[in-house]
């Protein structure tokens, strides 16, 4: 991996990790909302998860790293759980979707560190 590729992969992976963590946290708050607020929250989170899935698919296409595709598959599972109002389990599945993305970040960090860029 070239340093240029490492920078791109590191950036994409770290951004994905932050997005996944944010959405996982938001999913845990849905059960605490008022009944009339839950459908709107569910809609917004579903849309954000769909955007995240598309970002992961795009990252896989740009970088060639299958780990981003695995993360997209994990987000698909999260979307299925959200559709059946299983927000707690969906939040846990977000954590699982973050594992392959973390591997990309670690690999890229190793290259950047070896090149003394970090």
Enumerate the predicted regions with their spans.
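Long, charged/polar, soluble alpha-helical segments
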Residues: 1-118
